[in-house]
Amino acid sequence: MFRGAWMWPGKDAAALTICCCCCCWAPRQSDKPCADSERAQRWRLSLASLLFFTVLLADHLWLCAGARPRARELSSAMRPPWGAGRERQPVPPRAVLPPPPPSPGEPSASSGTCGPRYSNLTKAAPAAGSGPVCNGVPEPTGLDAACTKLESLQRLFEPTTPAPPLRPPDSPSRAPEFPSAKKNLLKGHFRNFTLSFCDTYTVWDLLLGMDRPDSLDCSLDTLLGDLLAVVASPGSGTWEACSNCIEAYQRLDRHAQEKYDEFDLVLHKYLQAEEYSIRSCTKGCKAVYKAWLCSEYFSVTQQECQNWVPCKQYCLEVQTRCPFILPDNEEMVYGGLPGFICTGLMDTSPKRPETKCCDVQWVSCESEKKKFKDSEPPKTHHQQFHHSYFHHYHHQYHHYHPRHEPPSRVSNKPSLLPVSGGSRLSPSRIRLCVLVLILLHTVVSFSSSQSGGGLGLETLPALEEGLTQEE
């Protein structure tokens, strides 16, 4: 009895110990599972944020380190110096009044001498000198010669004609009017000179439709009055009124060329540079943009045209032919807006009368491609079948394996890929994609492991409760 009485308390103590252990070690419903799930959720959010900011940082660093220095190199390489002239097609000679024969005591004017020359004199002078030397003084060339080559005009005017005053005393704000015959003499002279950049506009066009450049009086009557004063008194000086007007027109022409160079640089940066995947034919876009730009700077009607169209038509041509280039602004994000929008087309105010420009047949990339195909020799039946069967394969191969050809061959086969063409992955882009894939794999693996651990911890309270009930 004593032994049995002594053993039962030991069994009760053991049972109490087991119960206490079960009660102490059994996890509560709101313990580790909730904490682990919250910790896993925080890890997921942290890794997702890290992935997002890594992608943004890598893309921004790639743009800063690769695109902008390359664009500056292209800018310095593509922008020509202001002293160099552009190569232009020769302009057909216009019908002008032939110069009268020289006097017996005057030497005949030959090529390379100081005689009058009627041609397009707007090309840049050679680097060796400014022009032929006449009596020890370099003769001006280009558009500057329009006001200095006055030998023919001086012969056409009568020497005995008195020089009328520039401003009669009875009407100080109005120049004297001259007959149309003398104005036609100016027409025959100024129609031979065109601007350097906007070479489709003659000085005669500008004098007729834009006689107030920079608040100057460039009317025909003023120019004729000043010319007659110079002819009547040879020692009075140069044709000052003409020189001032020509300089004003040249300043506007240089401003137009600066704007065109900026547009050309943007097109080369986004459509022809190697850092960007877009390829497009921009020859027609540049030609239309130049015509529209000149029509905005010189709002005059072109006289030397066979057919005319409203100059506003040039703006619509630019809007349809040029690609959409969104502004490069880091502070704002543009979406769905074209890079060129025509405004003021419906403005018919009398302050700005409608001007007419030449109706030009623009050369497009499709027409050049058709012309190149027409010049190829005819293909046999086997060659046509081979071309049609393997066209898709070769197109894909050359798209993913571009070949750089010399400039002489590129001009014959222009790039005809659309603006929304497929992209080419550069090494930096490939490294960025690999980094993104690694981070995504890490997030998925960590989420899977946390989900598996969470399920194991959630089943732990149920097992402990079963053991407690059995005890």
Curated annotation (Swiss-Prot):
Domain of life (superkingdom): Eukaryota
Organism: Mus musculus (Mouse)
Residues the record marks as carrying a glycan: N120
Signal peptide residue numbers: none
Organism lineage string: Eukaryota, Metazoa, Chordata, Craniata, Vertebrata
PANTHER family reported for this sequence: NALCN CHANNEL AUXILIARY FACTOR 2 (PTHR15819:SF8), TRANSMEMBRANE PROTEIN FAM155 (PTHR15819)
Principal location class: membrane
InterPro entries linked to this entry: NALCN_aux_factor_1/2 (IPR055288)
Stretch list, region Disordered: 76-115, 158-178, 399-424
Listed name of the protein: NALCN channel auxiliary factor 2
CC annotations in GO: membrane
